C-alpha cells in the first residue's frame, strides 16, 4: 500500500523539527516505520543513532516488528525502539555513576511503593487508604513536574502539602539508601541529570542523532523536558500526536506540549494526516462535528474513502439492567444475521463499574467476552516471587524483595527473628540480607530461627556468586534449590492451578535465557538488566494481553484508545457518566469530549449509543439527562429509537427471554445443519 501525499511528506521531511498531527486511524505507525527506513536507507543515518519512543510495550513491540519487516534484522540492528521509561532506564544504567548510584539498583513496583509508604508514614497520616493513595499521586505529580523533596516542601501550601512533602523526603531518603528506583524516577533522574551535566547531555545528544516520539499528546512535563534535552540545538526530531485524543490529564499528560513545540522550536514543520483508513464517512462526520466544539490551535478534519456507511443508532433503556439486556439482544441478533465473529464487537463505557451488568447478561446468554485490564503475566504471584529472588541476587540492599522471599517457601524464620534482624541491620546501617552475614548476629539471634536464616542467606550467597559467572545456571539452580514446584503444589487450590503456575515459571526462565544469551537483533544482557527490564514490563503491561480469542471486548473508553472494532456500542451516554460528573463539577468538559471522540473513532462500520432513563447511583434512583455529546452530533445521521409503550419489568423480562430463546434456537438449528 502506497503512502498518501501527507504521509509521504511526513516521511521525507528530515531537515528540522517536525510535528505530525495524525488523526485517528490515519496510519501514523506506517509513517514512523517508513521514516526510520528512510533515515537509514535514504539519509545515511546509522540505526544505532536513531531512537523511537512510545508509551506502551505493545506499541514498541509492534513498531519493532514492522521496522524489522521493512529493513530486515541486520539493517535494523542497534536501533533503539522503546517506551519512554525503558529509554530512561537505559540512560540510568549507563550513567549511574554520574547519578551517585550503585550499578546494581532495583525497581520498585506499585505494591512495594504502597508497602513502604505505609510503613514510613505511620504516625504522620492516619491509617487511611484514600489519603495514602493521594500521597502516592502527589509524589508522582511532583516527580513528573521535576520537583525534588526540598522544592516540594518550599512550595507547600497548607498543612496537608507540608506533611506530604515531609513524607516525600522520607520516601526519597529510604529509596536512595536501598539503591531502589520507582517508575517516575526513570524519567525524573535522567532529565535532572541531562539538565545539570553538560558532558552527559552531549554524550546522549551524539548517541541519539534523530529522535521519533509517538503519542506525543500524552507527554507530561518531565517527558517533554527530556525530549528537549535529547534533541538539543540540532533539533532533528519527529513527534507524532493528536491533540483531539489527549485523554490522560489525570496522569499528568499535557496536550499543551504540542503548542509549546512551536514556541520552543520556531522552525517547526507541521504536517497533518487527515485521511482515515478505519471508519465510514458517517462515523467520521459525527466525530468531526463533535470535536469542533473544542477550541483548537491546529485545525484538522478527518475524511474517509470507505463509503458513507450505516446510520448511527441511539437506543434508550429504562434502567441499567434493561440497557445491558438490550445491548446483549442486539449483539446476538447482529452476530446471527451477519455471520460475524464475537471479537468484532466492543462495548465501551466511562467507568469500570458499568461492566458488571453487561457481564451478567453476556454470561447468562453464553456469549464469550473479555474485560480488558486483566492480570499481567508479571503481576502473577509466582512471577513476583521469582523476580524478588532475582532482585536480591542483583541488589542485596533491596529489603522489600528480601522480606518477600525469606519465607517463600516456608523456612521457619518467624516474625520475631525478622524483627531482631531488622533492629540489628538498622543500628549498623546495613540491608537485611547483608546484615545476616554479620558474625555478631549470633548473640542477638539463637536457636532454630538463626540456623534457618543463616542457612538460607548463605545458600543465596552461593547462588549470587554463581550468577556472576553463569547467570542461566544460577537461575536454574535457584528454582530447583528452593523446590518451588513442590511449594506451588502445596499452596495452589488444585493440581491444575499448580501446573499452570509452574508453566508460567518455565516461561519466565525461557524468556530470561533468551535475554541473557542475546539474538540477532538484541545484544546479550546482564542479569541485573534482565531483572530491571522484567520489573518495568510488569509496571507497563498491566491489562495488556497478547492473546486474541473470539470474545466480545468490554473496556473503558480510556483503554480503547489505539484499538479498532467493526461494531461498537458506547453505553451510558448520559450527563454524569459521559461527561463524568467530576468533570462537569471541575469544568473539564473538553477532555470528556475528547474521550467521546476517541470512542466514536474506534468504530469501523457501525456505531450504537445507549442511554438510560433511570439509574441507581449510591443507592438512590436518578433520572439522568441524555449526554450533551449526543445532542452535539449531526442529528440527520442518528436514528433515535422511537418511544415505546411502557411495559412492566416482568413483561419485559418475559419478552426479552423469549426473544433471546428464539435467537438461540435459530443458532442451534443452524449448528445442527452444519
Curated annotation (Swiss-Prot):
Biological process (GO) annotations held by this record are:
DNA replication; recombinational repair
Where the record annotates domain UvrD-like helicase C-terminal, the positions are 281-562
**InterPro entries, per database record:** DExx_box_DNA_helicase_dom_sf, DNA_helicase_UvrD-like_C, DNA_helicase_UvrD/REP, Helicase_Rep, P-loop_NTPase, UvrD-like_ATP-bd
Q: Name one GO cellular component term.
A: cytosol
In alphabetical order, the GO MF annotations are: 3'-5' DNA helicase activity; ATP binding; ATP hydrolysis activity; single-stranded DNA binding
Annotated transmembrane regions: none
**SUPFAM superfamilies in alphabetical order:** P-loop containing nucleoside triphosphate hydrolases
Q: Which domain of life is it from?
A: Bacteria
- List UniProt keywords, sorted A-Z: ATP-binding, DNA replication, DNA-binding, Helicase, Hydrolase, Isomerase, Nucleotide-binding
Tell me which Pfam families the record gives: UvrD-helicase (PF00580), UvrD_C (PF13361)
UniProt lists the family membership as follows: Belongs to the helicase family. UvrD subfamily.
User: Subunit composition?
Assistant: Homodimer.
Q: What does this protein do?
A: Rep helicase is a single-stranded DNA-dependent ATPase involved in DNA replication; it can initiate unwinding at a nick in the DNA. It binds to the single-stranded DNA and acts in a progressive fashion along the DNA in the 3' to 5' direction.
Q: What is this protein called?
A: ATP-dependent DNA helicase Rep
| Provenance organism | Salmonella typhimurium (strain LT2 / SGSC1412 / ATCC 700720)
Amino acid at each position: 500500500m502506497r503512502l498518501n501525499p501527507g504521509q509521504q511528506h511526513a516521511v521525507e521531511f528530515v531537515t528540522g523539527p517536525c510535528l505530525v498531527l495524525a488523526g485517528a486511524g490515519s496510519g501514523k505507525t506506517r509513517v514512523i516505520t517508513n521514516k526510520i527506513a528512510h533515515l537509514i536507507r535514504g539519509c545515511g543515518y546509522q540505526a544505532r543513532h536513531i531512537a523511537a519512543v512510545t508509551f506502551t510495550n505493545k506499541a514498541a513491540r509492534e513498531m519493532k516488528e514492522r521496522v524489522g519487516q521493512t529493513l530486515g534484522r541486520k539493517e535494523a540492528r542497534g536501533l533503539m525502539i522503546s517506551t519512554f521509561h525503558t529509554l530512561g532506564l537505559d540512560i540510568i544504567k549507563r550513567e549511574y555513576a554520574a547519578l551517585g548510584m550503585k550499578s546494581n539498583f532495583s525497581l520498585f513496583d506499585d505494591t512495594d511503593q504502597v508497602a513502604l509508604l505505609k510503613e514510613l508514614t505511620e504516625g504522620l497520616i492516619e491509617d487511611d487508604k484514600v489519603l495514602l493513595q493521594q500521597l502516592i499521586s502527589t509524589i508522582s505529580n511532583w516527580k513528573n513536574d521535576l520537583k525534588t523533596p526540598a522544592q516540594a516542601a518550599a512550595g507547600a501550601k497548607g498543612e496537608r502539602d507540608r506533611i506530604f512533602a515531609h513524607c516525600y523526603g522520607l520516601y526519597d531518603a529510604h529509596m536512595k539508601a536501598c539503591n531502589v528506583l520507582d517508575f517516575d524516577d526513570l524519567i525524573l533522574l535522567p532529565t535532572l541529570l541531562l539538565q545539570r551535566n553538560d558532558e552527559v547531555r552531549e554524550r546522549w545528544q551524539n548517541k541519539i542523532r534523530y529522535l521519533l516520539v509517538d503519542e506525543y499528546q500524552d507527554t507530561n512535563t518531565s517527558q517533554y523536558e527530556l525530549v528537549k534535552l535529547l534533541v538539543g540545538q540540532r533539533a532533528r526530531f519527529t513527534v507524532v500526536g493528536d491533540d483531539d485524543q489527549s485523554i490522560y490529564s489525570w496522569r499528568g499528560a499535557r496536550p499543551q506540549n504540542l503548542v509549546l513545540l512551536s514556541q520552543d522550536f520556531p522552525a517547526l514543520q507541521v504536517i497533518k494526516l487527515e485521511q482515515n483508513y478505519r471508519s465510514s464517512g458517517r462515523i467520521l462526520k459525527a466525530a468531526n462535528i463533535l470535536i469542533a466544539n473544542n477550541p483548537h490551535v491546529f485545525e484538522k478534519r478527518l475524511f474517509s474513502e470507505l463509503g458513507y456507511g450505516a446510520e448511527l443508532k441511539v437506543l434508550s433503556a429504562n434502567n441499567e439492567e434493561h440497557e445491558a439486556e438490550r445491548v446483549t439482544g442486539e449483539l446476538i441478533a447482529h452476530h446471527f444475521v451477519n455471520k460475524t465473529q464475537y471479537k468484532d464487537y466492543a462495548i465501551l463505557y466511562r467507568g469500570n463499574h458499568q461492566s458488571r451488568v453487561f457481564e451478567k447478561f453476556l454470561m447468562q446468554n453464553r456469549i464469550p467476552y473479555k474485560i480488558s485490564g486483566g492480570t499481567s503475566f508479571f503481576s502473577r504471584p509466582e512471577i513476583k516471587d521469582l523476580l524478588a529472588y532475582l532482585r536480591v541476587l542483583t541488589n542485596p540492599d533491596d529489603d522489600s524483595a528480601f522480606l518477600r522471599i525469606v519465607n517463600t517457601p516456608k523456612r521457619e524464620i518467624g516474625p520475631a527473628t525478622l524483627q531482631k534482624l531488622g533492629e540489628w541491620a538498622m543500628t549498623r546501617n546495613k540491608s537485611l540480607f547483608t546484615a545476616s552475614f554479620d558474625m555478631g548476629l549470633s548473640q542477638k539471634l539463637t536457636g532454630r530461627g538463626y540456623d534457618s536464616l543463616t542457612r538460607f542467606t548463605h545458600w543465596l550467597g552461593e547462588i549470587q556468586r554463581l550468577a556472576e559467572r553463569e547467570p542461566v545456571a544460577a537461575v536454574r539452580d535457584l528454582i530447583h534449590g528452593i523446590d518451588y514446584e513442590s511449594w506451588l503444589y502445596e499452596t495452589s487450590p488444585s493440581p491444575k492451578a499448580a501446573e499452570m503456575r509452574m508453566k508460567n515459571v518455565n516461561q519466565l526462565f525461557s524468556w530470561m535465557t533468551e535475554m541473557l544469551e542475546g539474538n540477532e537483533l538484541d545484544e546479550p544482557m546482564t542479569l541485573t538488566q534482565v531483572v530491571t527490564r522484567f520489573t518495568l514490563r510488569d509496571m507497563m503491561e498491566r491489562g495488556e494481553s497478547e492473546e486474541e480469542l473470539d470474545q466480545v471486548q468490554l473496556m473503558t473508553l480510556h483503554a480503547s484508545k489505539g484499538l479498532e472494532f467493526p461494531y461498537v456500542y458506547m453505553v451510558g451516554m448520559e450527563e454524569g457518566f459521559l461527561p463524568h460528573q467530576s468533570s462537569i463539577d471541575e469544568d473539564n468538559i473538553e477532555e470528556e469530549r475528547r474521550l467521546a471522540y476517541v470512542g466514536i473513532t474506534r468504530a469501523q462500520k457501525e456505531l450504537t449509543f445507549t442511554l438510560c432513563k433511570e439509574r441507581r447511583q449510591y443507592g438512590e434512583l436518578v433520572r439522568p439527562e441524555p449526554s450533551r455529546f449526543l445532542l452535539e452530533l449531526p442529528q440527520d445521521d442518528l436514528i433515535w429509537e422511537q418511544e415505546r409503550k411502557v411495559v412492566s419489568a416482568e413483561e419485559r423480562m418475559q419478552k426479552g427471554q423469549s426473544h433471546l430463546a428464539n435467537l438461540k434456537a435459530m443458532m442451534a438449528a443452524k449448528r445442527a445443519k452444519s
